[in-house]
Design a protein with these regions (language model features):
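Gly/Pro-rich hinge or "lid" segments in bacterial periplasmic/extracellular proteins
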Residues: 179-257
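Ligand-site clamp/hinge motif
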Residues: 241-296
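Periplasmic-binding protein-like
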Residues: 322-372, 519-527
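Extracytoplasmic/peripheral linker and loop segments enriched in polar/acidic and small residues
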Residues: 341-344, 351-354, 380, 436-444, ...
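Structural transition elements
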Residues: 348-398, 412-417
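Long beta-strand-rich cores associated with HINT superfamily self-processing modules
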Residues: 540-567
Length: 567
């Protein structure tokens, strides 16, 4: 059955209704293992590195590496009180008191402690650097605003103090699911009793060893995974990972919260033969970009397609063939954005009158359902809406080129993105611009920085798979100088300042002024070209209960510990 639904709380309500049914289900009626697939690879346990953020780590481990918050279906950071509590301390400077639950511990028996928060802050703040950052963090959003963390090694309490004037608006998302990694494992790898002392002391030698492990020590290779490096502080833990049997999560016996409803979840990442797994009964939940792959027969499944918080976009290199802004504008001018939205942007559902998937997205800085979006989006006017060969030709000439070749990379296979690149190639050819499909199953956004492609098709920061949240902070920071996810290498000092200011203000007039100024700059510099809100499809087998589609970076697995499959 195919169900058409728009952005709403309908699925959440349906999930809550299902909860009442599962509460009445006897354990003997439950299938002990559930298969889950999504459209990204899983090659890292650390979702915060550049490569980890580009992988499916966040979707795979959101209920393995829990934090003080999680990303709900509406895209907001919701408190997770199983881990502990966060309280705002009164005062002129934003100060947060974190208290970890007394029973909180990892699956290897080590207690959760404020050490975990200190490691997350050090790794994601960008403050530890030589000629380059020691930690290969995807983004410093929010963490760079923290001035200090008061933590006694091994303690359950931490006081987080922000810099004056840097009251980060999205603070509830900090130290959230997949942000907190086991600091005791990093300390052991670095050969020190704890990570707190060397980080607080600024001991670059020791911090460098900690960073080396944080950067690469949690890389996952199917068939050779050392689970001793992967202790869990959530309802599930990693049991095994092989190409043949998938990534196997099992119930964490050390979990102090409500036990998971199902003892075993098997994750089948990108590259899996999904139709074959559906046919042999191995898959029960599928979360993918709409139209990305042919699922084959889905008889016995319910399908929901809806707009997501992620914005499908092209991220351009600022070197090589596209070093000149005029060259990037030439490419943007020949792309039929409105036609692409009409054919690929809202498959299976009518475009709503406003909000996500109502039309092409005309802002990189604001979500389509925010109050200021219409005014900010008006900045672009009627430019770049349809293929404009005259404009493309003039911009190409201004760049000093008579012809241009643009290699577009993305994680393959993906039928929808393949269609998009093919349409780009057709329209741009008439302007003297050759568009080549440079996708591959091994593709990573870092290829843009390496110069092996000229543009990446994906979400903000060139990310494949599920992306986005109600806050546009991470998307904005992907445009900031030096940020890991800024794989195109874009740099503009005024944009840096605007991104920083938007992160700490909630005044609508100020937000409008900043975002409007920012978009004026960005449409001229063209570091990226937003297309439309990515449509996401969630497919659920009959008998599944409590699966609530989550069209954000968290993906459908955000509440997998509540999933039940009835016989």
């Amino acid at each position: 059955m195919h169900v058409e639904r728009r952005w709403s709380a309908a699925l959440l309500a349906a999930g809550l209704a299902a909860a009442s049914l599962t509460a009445c289900s006897a354990s003997e009626d439950k299938v002990p293992s559930i298969g889950y697939s999504f459209d990204n690879v899983v090659n890292n346990y650390n979702a915060r590195t550049v490569d980890g953020a580009a992988s499916g780590a966040r979707q795979a481990f959101t209920r393995v590496q829990v934090g003080f918050s999680y990303l709900g279906p509406d895209g907001d950071a919701l408190s997770d009180n199983d881990i502990g509590t966060v309280a705002v301390v009164p005062g002129d400077v934003l100060t947060l008191q974190y208290t970890i639950a007394p029973a909180a511990k990892y699956s290897d028996g080590a207690p959760m402690a404020c050490d975990d928060l200190v490691l997350a802050w050090a790794a994601n703040s960008g403050r530890f650097a030589t000629d380059r950052p020691l930690f290969d963090a995807a983004s410093t959003a929010g963490y760079s605003d923290i001035a200090s963390i008061d933590c006694v090694p091994g303690s359950k309490d931490a006081t987080v103090v922000f810099a004056p004037g840097r009251s980060y608006q999205n603070w509830r998302a900090l130290f959230g699911a997949t942000d907190l990694l086991p600091a005791h494992v990093a300390a052991r790898a670095a050969g020190v009793p704890n990570v707190v002392d060397p980080i607080v002391a600024g001991d670059d030698g020791v911090v460098s060893r900690i960073a080396d492990f944080w950067n690469t020590g949690w890389t996952l290779t199917p068939g050779s995974v050392d689970t001793s490096l992967l202790p869990s502080a959530g309802p599930y833990r990693v049991d095994s990972y092989t190409p043949e049997d998938g990534l196997v999560l099992v119930a964490n016996d050390a979990w102090w919260g409500i036990p998971p409803e199902t003892q075993r979840v098997v994750i089948w990442p990108k590259g899996t033969d999904v139709p074959a797994k559906i046919a042999d009964g191995s898959l029960d939940v599928i979360d993918q970009g709409a139209g990305a792959i042919d699922l084959g027969s889905t008889e016995g499944f319910e399908t929901v397609t809806e707009p997501s918080r992620g914005v499908e976009q092209l991220t351009f290199a600022t070197q090589g063939a596209l070093a000149e802004a005029s060259a990037r504008r030439a490419v943007a001018a020949c792309i039929p954005r409105t036609d692409l939205f009409d054919t690929l942007g809202h498959p299976g559902f009518e475009a709503p009158p406003a909000g996500p998937s109502s039309s092409v997205v005309d802002s990189r800085l604001m979500q389509p359902d925010t109050l200021v979006y219409p005014s900010v989006a008006a900045t672009v006017g009627d430019r770049y809406q349809r293929s404009d060969l005259d404009r493309a030709g003039k911009e190409l000439a201004a760049s000093g080129n008579s012809a241009l070749t643009v290699r577009v990379g993305y994680l393959a296979p993906d039928a929808r993105r393949s269609q998009l690149v093919s349409r780009m190639a057709t329209d741009c050819a008439a302007a003297g611009i050759t568009v080549e499909d440079a996708s591959s199953p091994e593709f990573t956004p870092s290829a843009l920085r390496a110069g092996t492609v000229d543009a990446v098709l994906g979400g903000a920061g060139s990310l494949p798979g599920p992306t986005g949240s109600a806050s546009s902070v991470v998307a904005r920071y992907s445009l900031r100088t030096g940020i890991g996810l800024n794989v195109g290498g874009y740099s503009n000092g005024r944009i840096d300042s605007i991104v920083d200011q938007l992160a700490v203000t909630d005044d609508p007039e100020r937000v409008l002024a900043l975002a409007t100024e920012g978009e004026n700059i960005l449409w001229n510099d063209m570091p990226s070209l937003p297309l439309y809100s990515e449509p996401r499809t969630t497919v659920v087998s009959d008998g599944m209960q409590d699966v609530v589609a989550n069209p954000t970076a968290a993906g459908a697995g955000w509440n997998m510990d509540r999933w039940v499959l009835l016989k």
